[in-house]
């Protein structure tokens, strides 16, 4: 087993290797003067079980091309099996036709990864579970819920916690966390009038006196969560904390979170935190290295990955 990484999230790749007690593979990923990407694998991978850790996060297109070229380099170097480890799968929100004459980009990206030569995909909290079916190769979608649930238990009295979905579409994810915490569930019903804007409408469930835990897979602009926090506090919640798997945090999201009613935003390191995120007073990062590392180990040993969530 050998683990390699592109440039998107080397800190996470190094942490995964530390968990596995293996060195990070020696590979060069650089750009020519015209910004073409060049990859060179600097050690023998012939006959090896290779894992490439690469989030296709901002800049998504550059990191995607790095991944594709690394897969191609491994295939041409006679690796026995190539697993693309995608802590964050970019383009996942483009999982359906949004209107006439629009693409399904998530499917296209899945095809590209497959055609480049990947034999298997390992990813975390896909935006929509059915994206697994976009790949024509085995795909394991891991869940961050055990990590998030453990952190909630470490920081809150679960007897007073209520898990809240920020929209109707996230109810399944919220229910899974509430089951792990053995607590009640509430829903924020919102209306999105136009792209980039969200308006909180009302809260379904009695949150009065509760420590509310908002749960979602992605925070991008932060508008939905900040508005949801305000609505919950108006309904009598004692505090509101958001637990989000993927901290995209584009544009002015970090500043928006910092000035919001959120007690804290907890994200994973599926996307490498920026300096702004690391210095924010109310944003905290929890590691997925153990989860991803164990999944990689089980894959290499031909053991069950689903057993991680039993």
UniProtKB/Swiss-Prot annotation:
GO biological process: 5-phosphoribose 1-diphosphate biosynthetic process; purine nucleotide biosynthetic process; ribonucleoside monophosphate biosynthetic process
Residue sites binding Mg(2+) 2 per the record: 167
Record text on cofactor binding: Binds 2 Mg(2+) ions per subunit.
Alphabetized InterPro entries for the sequence: PRib_PP_synth_CS, Pribosyltran_N, PRibTrfase_dom, PRTase-like, Rib-P_diPkinase, Rib-P_diPkinase_bac
Entry GO CC: cytoplasm; ribose phosphate diphosphokinase complex
Top EC class of this enzyme: transferase
Pathway, per record: Metabolic intermediate biosynthesis; 5-phospho-alpha-D-ribose 1-diphosphate biosynthesis; 5-phospho-alpha-D-ribose 1-diphosphate from D-ribose 5-phosphate (route I): step 1/1
Binding site for D-ribose 5-phosphate: 192, 216, 220-224
Its biological purpose: Involved in the biosynthesis of the central metabolite phospho-alpha-D-ribosyl-1-pyrophosphate (PRPP) via the transfer of pyrophosphoryl group from ATP to 1-hydroxyl of ribose-5-phosphate (Rib-5-P).
Protein name: Ribose-phosphate pyrophosphokinase
Lineage summary: Bacteria, Pseudomonadati, Pseudomonadota, Alphaproteobacteria, Hyphomicrobiales
